[in-house]
Structure formats: C-alpha cells, structure tokens
Amino acid sequence: WYPEEFAQVAAELSEKYDIVIFGGLGEVDIANDIEKSLIEKGVTNYQNLAGKTTIPELINQISSLDLFITGDSGPMHIAATFQIPTVAIFGPTNHDETSQWMNEKSMIVKKNLECQPCMKRTCPLKHHNCMKMVVASDVLRAVKTFN
C-alpha cells in the first residue's frame, strides 16, 4: 500500500492509539516516508521500528497491540495468533488463500477488480489499481467495525 495512505490512517488514529511503524530492512524507506508524513501532520506519538526488530522482538511488539493495520504479510499472521484486531489490505494477492486464520477480529479491505488476484508484485496491466484504489477512508471504515 502507499506510504501517504498509511500515514493518513495513522494520523487519524493517533488521537486514540499510539502508532508503531513496522517493516523489514527492505521497507525502511517506505517507513521513513510514513514517519515524515506523520511529522508534517504534527503526530508525535509514534515509533518507527522498521528494520530495527528481530523476529522475537516483532512478535512481542505485535502481541501487545490494540489494533494492527497491515498488508498481506507475515506479521499479519502473527497478529492473528494473538487475536489482535486487524485490518488487512489486499491487492494482488488472494485473500481466500492467505488471509488471517482463526482471528474473529479481522477485516479485509480490498477492491473487487476483474484482474484480482493476479499474484504479481508488479502489475501486469501497469496500473496497480488494486492498491491505488484502496484509500485511507476504506481502512478507517473497517477500523470502526471494531469500536
């Protein structure tokens, strides 16, 4: 998903939640873009842990969250293990095959496009609408189902 959309969601939720940005070493630049947007929006209650945690530390951090917003990822499944309310954003991947298992507090946000799921990291149609069309308000609407 796009850093500006993650940042918009985080900024909106920062009045109720402390924000934690997770990511692997390959996602540090994206996390830094999110952090920069949060700073510009005046959000101060956040931590950027991208590229800074071991797997056990990541598990420990996720296990203590009140809410987790993520793409289709390994950490999404960690959150399911701990029954963390999760909003999972799906684009090119197949939510029927890879969404959370056994988490009753899970919401999937996706667009229903003919080209989904293509299972490609790079859009074969060159538009990546499956991710571009998911906007912050879609995710925030899903978060409200937990309240």
Question: What are these model-predicted stretches?
Answer:
Residues 35, 45-49, 80-147:
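Nucleotide-sugar donor-binding patch of glycosyltransferase catalytic domains
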Residues 2-91:
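Donor-binding and catalytic core of enzymes assembling or modifying cell-surface/extracellular glycoconjugates
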